[in-house]
């Protein structure tokens, strides 16, 4: 009977990369002071025995680092491994445990590059497993519940945190000290309650099986950097980043991706000498950058990031510039993804 039950359950692979969900503190009172990336995947799985009721689960340690240290090479390595597993007939869904600092970047990268409709779920925690009221175990349980559910297919890469199912494209970390840290400007896709998924909306942008980007065809990514704008900003950082090899600069601007009059000449010159300029917004609750509203984007040959924050804009530009250097094509890609 146990064998029959296992045959009925979905097969889910948990790929572990480190982060707070694999962290440990000196005492149970340490919810914010701890060392990330200490606990291995087998111990994570053993800590949630209820996973066996949801799926046939096996784990694999892909890397063991804090997510602020993840590089483009790490993203490519992870993406290629996920793609290999997604191609396997005996894998129904994949969960990736990840640090929360750059979880939103990895989720969006995978959303753009994995040509599969199988459920891919990225999950983390805001507290280490050693802390009182740790959130990692339930987050992992919810992630496996979503990944093992056929209704999760075709919805792009998902993120499960704090009982919510978020789109990997839309979600971002909004605070660093609370468990309800991950929000989407346009709201969650759904909720998980006691292992059952409830869906409220679908992603509107191109992703996964409808994406023109394929992780299997990408071996390297161009250097793209982010420069932060503020009152009394100077052009020093922008020029330095371009001089040090940035093929594109994400302008993390105020408001509508606004460009200070002190910056405009430098950004115009950088664009004329070959550096792509992408205007984004660093407002807290989600920017929405309009083209040619205040800045003459057509005249300056600049690109706008639409509703993507600077971090996600960087991911999309890196992938887009593998295919094209044309600013009009880059803008088309921003509208569609």
Curated annotation (Swiss-Prot):
Quaternary structure, from the entry: Homotetramer.
GO biological process: asparagine metabolic process
Native source species: Pseudomonas sp. (strain ATCC 29598 / 7A)
Active site: 20
E.C. code: 3.5.1.38
Disulfide bridge positions per record: none
Class of enzymatic activity (EC top level): hydrolase
UniProt name for this protein: Glutaminase-asparaginase
Keyword Aminoacyl-tRNA synthetase: no
Entry-linked PROSITE patterns: ASN_GLN_ASE_1, ASN_GLN_ASE_2, ASN_GLN_ASE_3
Protein's cellular compartments: Periplasm
Binding-site positions, substrate: 67, 100-101
Cellular component, GO annotation: periplasmic space
GO MF assignments: asparaginase activity; glutamin-(asparagin-)ase activity; glutaminase activity
The keyword Hydrolase belongs to this UniProt entry's keyword annotation: yes
Signal peptide: none
InterPro entries to which the protein is assigned, alphabetical: AsnASE_II, Asp/glu_Ase-like_sf, Asparaginase/glutaminase-like, Asparaginase/glutaminase_AS1, Asparaginase/glutaminase_AS2, Asparaginase_C, L-asparaginase_C, L-asparaginase_N
SUPFAM superfamilies: Glutaminase/Asparaginase
Reaction catalysed by this enzyme: L-glutamine + H2O = L-glutamate + NH4(+); L-asparagine + H2O = L-aspartate + NH4(+)
Alphabetized UniProt keyword annotations: Hydrolase, Periplasm
Record domain Asparaginase/glutaminase: where: 10-337
Main localisation: periplasm
Family, as annotated: Belongs to the asparaginase 1 family.
